[in-house]
Design a protein with these regions (language model features):
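Positively charged n-region of N-terminal signal peptides that target proteins for export
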Residues: 1-4
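N-terminal "domain-start" segment that seeds a small globular fold
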Residues: 10-34
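Short loop/turn microsegments at loop-to-beta-strand junctions
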Residues: 19, 41, 117-118
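Structural signature of beta-strand start/N-cap positions in the alpha/beta core
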Residues: 39-41, 73, 99
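Conserved hydrophobic packing residues within short motifs/helices of P-loop NTPase cores
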Residues: 41-43, 75-77, 121
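Structural microenvironment flanking redox-active thiols in thiol-disulfide oxidoreductases
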Residues: 54-94, 105-108
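Thiol/disulfide oxidoreductase modules built on the thioredoxin-like
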Residues: 89-96, 102-147
Length: 154
């Protein structure tokens, strides 16, 4: 019972904290949840040394490229790196088209405890955190989830 209560409190803290995030990407652009009202927002924590993180990058690129001008924003937060240039060079080599934030513990704290990498947070168009996943994601899973929630509200 105590574990359930602690888990619930952690999830509530994540929701309350993450709703106010402010992230500056590698190009100097500031991303806030409020600036994306009306759109789904996917925030993905990853690292260059993390195989599951690398496996999901093509899906994140595909999601960003398909929906960036319509209903979904993708933001990547690189964690556990020693050299920012290494991360940015890696992102270029992978043709990552979505914004990359050079993360740290202060940035991660805006979302609550980071359980592992990769971790993905999904916010609905109203700005509410509606899902998060520790571990890899797929394009199909994200699209299915968004479509299921979008059809419910119609």
């Amino acid at each position: 019972m105590l574990k359930r209560i602690l888990l619930l409190l952690t999830m509530l803290a994540v929701t309350a904290t993450a709703s106010a995030f402010s992230l500056t990407d590698s190009k100097g652009k500031v991303h806030t949840l409020d600036s994306y009202k009306g759109k789904w927002v996917l925030v993905n924590f990853w690292a260059t040394w993390c195989p599951p993180c690398l496996d999901e990058i093509p899906a994140l690129i595909a999601l960003h490229d398909k929906y960036k001008n319509s209903r979904l924003e993708v933001i990547g937060i690189a964690m556990e790196y020693q050299n920012p240039k290494q991360v940015l060079d890696f992102a270029d080599s992978m043709f990552i088209s979505y914004p990359i934030v050079l993360g740290n513990s202060k940035i991660a704290a805006q979302f609550g405890p980071l359980q592992g990498l990769p971790t993905t947070y999904l916010f609905d168009p109203a700005g509410k955190m509606v899902a998060y996943q520790v571990g890899g994601i797929t394009q199909q899973a994200v699209e299915s989830y968004i479509n299921s929630k979008s059809t419910v509200k119609k």
